[in-house]
Amino acid sequence: MEAQSKKDMRRTTGVQSQTETVSINNSLTKASLTLSTESGRRGGELRWHISNDGKSKGERSLDFDRDVLGVEVKDKRIKLKAFEVLQKESLFFGKGEKERVRKDYVFEMETEEKATLWGRTISECIESLGRPKELFVIVNPFGGKRCGPKIFEKEVKPLLEAAGINFKMQETRYGMHAKEIAYSLDLSKYDGIACVSGDGVVVEVVNGLLKREDWKQAITMPLGIIPGGTGNGMAKSLLHSVREEYSASNATFAIVRGCKCPLDVASVVQGDKSLLRIFGLRKYDGKIQFVPALGYEEFGEPIGESNKWKGETVILQDAFGNSGGSEMHGYKGSSTEFEESKWRFINGPFVTVWIQNVPWASKDIMPAPQAKFSDGCLDLVIVKDCPKTVLLSLLLSIRDGSHVYSPFVTYLKVKALKLEPGQRVGDPTMGGIVDMDGELIARGDDAIHHDPNWMDYGTPFLMKVDEGLATLFCPN
């Protein structure tokens, strides 16, 4: 059998190929197993001829990296568990859009020995792709329409099982539970953490990892994002970057494949309180100071003596909200400092201020179309005072990112940012709101209810970026 395998094997530069006669749907055909042996390339493919009544109907193929979850061998049969892109059938227009579909392909070999050899070869090829073997899955049962557990059972779990990935699932029970989990989790047992949630839980996990004593190692743990909440901008941004359809299944497959990319982490603090990543205001006076990224130096005005920053000393909290001075452990925030001459400013009034490090804020809102996962910048979007008709138009155009072309919108990339929220124009007794991924964390003194955990409205915020500090599972 080994001699036969060597005889059937063809080698070209960086490629190893083998052809066998197989049976598919009781029809004999030729199938070719091709592996890439070139350094830096991933996987291989299985290609076979399709025939009907002895007539050729073309070829089909499965790419082990892009299309296959796993392989199973029983007797003379090889089952390839695929999650491949197929064309939808349109009722009125023939072929429709493409979508990923879960499908099994069974190939019957001539002998059990050949089935075992091919099965082992395919399995080793998939193994070489660097996919995760052990995952810790955090499910938020409260986010969005409270569908997290259902999404996990119907869309996530079947794909993980088909891929042969072991996992432990835990549901969050209260706010900041995911942060506590990440803070205390034995990371040596896992190859990644997957979150079935909105963006808020992902932020909690990042904060938990960064509060650990071993944060430098902990933050390298790859994070997977599966949409299951209200704000799913991170998952939408990842899938949109490779033109994949937005779905929990596609996000899960991105984790299964094991591709990774770096993610910028923004340190946002106010006095001794850790803060936010995204926030929005109504029409308010306020002050924004920033260090523009390369190519955006013409935005704003240079800071003069009257506009110098009068913010407080920046101290981060420990894992659960206690400031710790010299005894504090964990990530201390970005250490990058900027010369005073680099800072510029823009004063209000503003209708809205958005700060993003990914393009999408949710599945249908794209405030920052030029945002990148790891460019060391934050994308700053400022909506200035404008007529209500213009504001309505902006709310519609923000769905595709075209709002940034409006003369009432200022859009730029910054390396650092300082924000001092102001009071509402025409009514200085009314303040605005500050939120992080949909969670309210600060609002004006006029609020009927004031949570003691909220930040102080009106006190300046400072935000800086650590480029590529965290790691994400990504589609490609």
Model-flagged regions — what are they?
Residues L33, L46, W118, L135-N140, ...:
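Structural signal for hydrophobic/aromatic residues that build the beta-strand cores
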Residues K150, A162, T172-Y174, L187, ...:
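Catalytic core of DAGKc-family lipid kinases
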Residues D53, V85-Q87, F142-G144, Y174-G175, ...:
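Conserved beta-strand elements of beta-rich interaction domains across eukaryotes
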Residues F350-T389:
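Active-site beta-loop-alpha substructure in enzyme catalytic cores
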Residues E2-V196, V203, N207-L210, N250:
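ATP/NTP phosphate-donor binding region
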Residues A251, I255-G258, P262, L275-I288, ...:
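Catalytic phosphate-donor-binding core of small-molecule kinases
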Residues A115-T116, G422-N476:
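Generic C-terminus detector
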